[in-house]
């Protein structure tokens, strides 16, 4: 559903943000 997609999008965004901060 829409909320599942939204949750996944937020999760992916958070992971990308963490990775960019770590620089790895």
UniProtKB/Swiss-Prot annotation:
Keywords: Amphibian defense peptide, Antibiotic, Antimicrobial, Immunity, Innate immunity, Secreted
Record keyword Secreted present: yes
GO CC aspect terms: extracellular region
UniProt tissue specificity: Expressed by the skin glands.
Cysteine disulfide links: none
A biological-process GO annotation: innate immune response
Protein family per UniProt: Belongs to the frog skin active peptide (FSAP) family. Frenatin subfamily.
Functional summary from the UniProt entry: Very weak antimicrobial peptide since it does not show activity below 100 ug/ml against Bacillus cereus, Escherichia coli, Leuconostoc mesenteroides, Micrococcus luteus, Pastewella haemolytica, Staphylococcus aureus, Streptococcus faecalis and Streptococcus uberis.
The name this protein goes by in its record: Frenatin-4
Native source species: Nyctimystes infrafrenatus
């Amino acid at each position: 559903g829409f909320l599942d997609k939204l949750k996944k999008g937020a999760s992916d965004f958070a992971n990308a943000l963490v990775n960019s901060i770590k620089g790895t």
